[in-house]
Amino acid sequence: MGGGAESDSDVTEGPRHALPRGRVDWALCFYVSSGAPASIRALFSEVVSPRVGCWSTPHFSCLILPSSWPDTMGVTCVSQMPVAEGKSVQQTVELLTRKLEMLGAEKQGTFCVDCETYHTAASTLGSQGQAGKLMYVMHNSEYPLSCFALFENGPCLVADTNFDVLMVKLKGFFQSAKASKIETRGTRYQYCDFLVKVGTVTMGPSARGISVEVEYGPCVVASDCWSLLLEFLQSFLGSHTPGAPAVFGNRHDAVYSPADTMVQYMELFNKIRKQQQILWMGRDLERTSSLSCNFSQYPT
Amino acid sequence: MADVLSVGVNLEAFAQAISAIQALRSSVSRVFDCLKDGMRNKETLEGREKAFIAHFQDNLHSVNRDLNELERLSNLVGKPSENHPLHNSGLLSLDPVQDKTPLYSQLLQAYKWSNKLQYHAGLASGLLNQQSLKRSANQMGVSAKRRPKAQPTTLVLPPQYVDDVISRIDRMFPEMTIHLSRPNGTSAMLLVTLGKVLKVIVVMRSLFIDRTIVKGYNENVYTEDGKLDIWSKSNYQVFQKVTDHATTALLHYQLPQMPDVVVRSFMTWLRSYIKLFQAPCQRCGKFLQDGLPPTWRDFRTLEAFHDTCRQ
């Protein structure tokens, strides 16, 4: 990254997993490198100039995964738990947490992961005929000082939380999708070296599903401990135990990073969104077919 | 039968001897009585002196006679206890009521037992002196003179030799990297990184391993001022358990004559943790027990077991 600044960030560290700053980069370098047209460069000078008064510091730390990322976390598996037959989302969550407490897990506060979708504005699409890419900007309460920006199948950017402000500045190039905010909230449970987070996924006002995240802190290589993780998942998810997440297969024995967890959450949210779309489409079909039935009752 | 007879004879002699002792005592006390009374009841001083000396002589003669009599009798009595290996306590065997007071048989057993104990203790101390298991020089206080002799072989090795041994071990195991540093004088500290599984801090004194701490691969092993943190333990229960087992291994692998072999055995054992999260327990076949993977590695076979599954 060309614009690597020499100064280290002076941001204080967060509670757990505070992401350390190995080196400091200008956030826009990421954007420029990920295929922005040359016209962006004009904006570049505006953003970094001291005239932008909304930041306490003009420095902006940013790292591109995986090459320059120094931090690690325990191997984590994020999965969806289907809602039990004849039960509400809330009841299924309670069932699951009771099972965890029976196992001996201890409650340890709450967590929240949220995700907002952006799509590239039509005006910025170059003449090369690039398709509009979706970008997801996510936050995780486990890393309160960081913000994650992901492309589907693309690179993952880990930045300071004031990246959100930058996104406002960039609204000519990335536009927020309407009512796209999706988040999961719930309780953290600690069992031995395992950290289990059971959350309710909500889109707008209504609950759409259940997310289960299991982190095994001591191990940092996904392929090493998948069997062990699977045994633990089976102990409380039973028949709903998921298969190995796709991110496990991608990088053979690389060190697992927080960004991998965010990718899993992004995939989970997309899956739930698609399920909702299918549900709505189904309902629409039902409505139209019932209408046509009604019509058929009338003689033409 | 002859025994009983001789005892009977002796008993008679005893009775005579006792009365002879009584006679001796009374004659001796008469001597002192006479001395106490002094000279009296005679008109002339000469008469008094003569009577006193005669009386005193008589008394001494009777003492002499009684003493001779006692000596004669004591020869008759003899020394019956001398024949017995237990000396006087052997006389307990003469007690006719064996059933009520089985003192003698108990005494014999205790005697045998203590004899054996002494014999075995002697053998053990001989063997232990050949193979000194003492890890530190301070404890060799038994013979302070020998201490300087024992030190050169085990505790005072040139740092260059320690470096050589460690670098040889480092080359032996490709998945293990060993970083050696000497922050405080000549004692080496090793930071062993095993694959992407764990890190071990090993504190050495010469080629003796004094302390080990096992931590996770993603845990910080340095203090704020950049030194190796040899005091704080791992945040994860699994590595706290492995630390305990590693300390057990330190005490298990002991060969004071060849300290380099000890370090090599320990490292070989440690290397088996490369599969800490991948190897199921050899006994129950499961990965988890109370939320922990199989943390124990057998010292000989290096097989994985849960702490509670090993013998």
Curated annotation (Swiss-Prot), chain B:
Top-rank taxon, per record: Eukaryota
Entry keyword Nucleus: yes
Keywords: Activator, Methylation, Nucleus, Phosphoprotein, Transcription, Transcription regulation
Residue numbers bearing the N6-methyllysine modification: 134
Gene Ontology cellular component list: core mediator complex; cytosol; mediator complex; nucleolus; nucleoplasm
InterPro entries tied to this protein: Mediator_Med27 (IPR021627)
Oligomeric form and interacting partners: Component of the Mediator complex, which is composed of MED1, MED4, MED6, MED7, MED8, MED9, MED10, MED11, MED12, MED13, MED13L, MED14, MED15, MED16, MED17, MED18, MED19, MED20, MED21, MED22, MED23, MED24, MED25, MED26, MED27, MED29, MED30, MED31, CCNC, CDK8 and CDC2L6/CDK11. The MED12, MED13, CCNC and CDK8 subunits form a distinct module termed the CDK8 module. Mediator containing the CDK8 module is less active than Mediator lacking this module in supporting transcriptional activation.
Function according to Swiss-Prot or TrEMBL: Component of the Mediator complex, a coactivator involved in the regulated transcription of nearly all RNA polymerase II-dependent genes. Mediator functions as a bridge to convey information from gene-specific regulatory proteins to the basal RNA polymerase II transcription machinery. Mediator is recruited to promoters by direct interactions with regulatory proteins and serves as a scaffold for the assembly of a functional preinitiation complex with RNA polymerase II and the general transcription factors.
Name by which UniProt lists this protein: Mediator of RNA polymerase II transcription subunit 27
Protein's organism: Bos taurus
Source lineage: Eukaryota, Metazoa, Chordata, Craniata, Vertebrata
Name of the coding gene: MED27
